């Protein structure tokens, strides 16, 4: 069945008004999209940011009366409609289309992230099974990719790893598949902990090798390797805590950092770590290093 799609060019201030109005006139879905390829890197806590120029897409049943729809929408919003476009779009298997667009990804020499419905391109490689669509990290974001590539380049055999802000558990699970003896994950979101457990099970990892905790319950023991893919602000404020969680001689990898934030993050860790050159991908950075002996 085809659909009628209405596209409106709006500002953030208009978003709620037009979203409510579109739903009231019968939209079966409403989606916000970036109209000008404007990135939003680190929004303030408690905010739901939108782009300065946003496209609002609404889908209606194909037999919807376009003239009546626009007239009713203008009445509800109290004035002339912004720039808009209406077109008929064909129905399709949206789930299949989404699945076809997600292919296995390689990180470093050995590691692949492979969706569960796809055959591993290199069966003898280190293949981590993980599906896209989670809110917690699937390897597609540059910060996750930076951390995965770093892990692939380390000698992890027999190491104890801490994934701070574990999300989907992708980094800890990758470390275990790459040879780490044990990994611990921590996250402020209970749903992230559940996602980590599920993904570990999917990859054949026993719960004892990858326990996960809320921060308040995290055992105070030092790790051989700590990875933290969060954001620059928390990385700076948590520097004393994260430093204390890495044993002398242990390794640290931090991401979620923009270029203009790198100096502050490096300064927060330079007193205790010999830091490597900064790595960059698509505007995001990774800072890594080795903790000096006390």
From Swiss-Prot:
Entry EC number(s): 2.1.1.-
Keyword Transferase assigned: yes
Substrates-to-products reaction catalysed: L-lysyl-[protein] + 3 S-adenosyl-L-methionine = N(6),N(6),N(6)-trimethyl-L-lysyl-[protein] + 3 S-adenosyl-L-homocysteine + 3 H(+)
Pfam families named in the record: PrmA (PF06325)
Coiled-coil residues: none
Protein's cellular compartments: Cytoplasm
InterPro entries from the UniProt entry: Ribosomal_L11_MeTrfase_PrmA, Ribosomal_PrmA_MeTrfase, SAM-dependent_MTases_sf
Positions that bind S-adenosyl-L-methionine: 144, 165, 187, 229
Signal peptide (residue range): none
CDD domains: AdoMet_MTases
An annotated GO cellular component: cytosol
Keyword Cell inner membrane: no
Function according to Swiss-Prot or TrEMBL: Methylates ribosomal protein L11.
Family: Belongs to the methyltransferase superfamily. PrmA family.
Protein known as: Ribosomal protein L11 methyltransferase
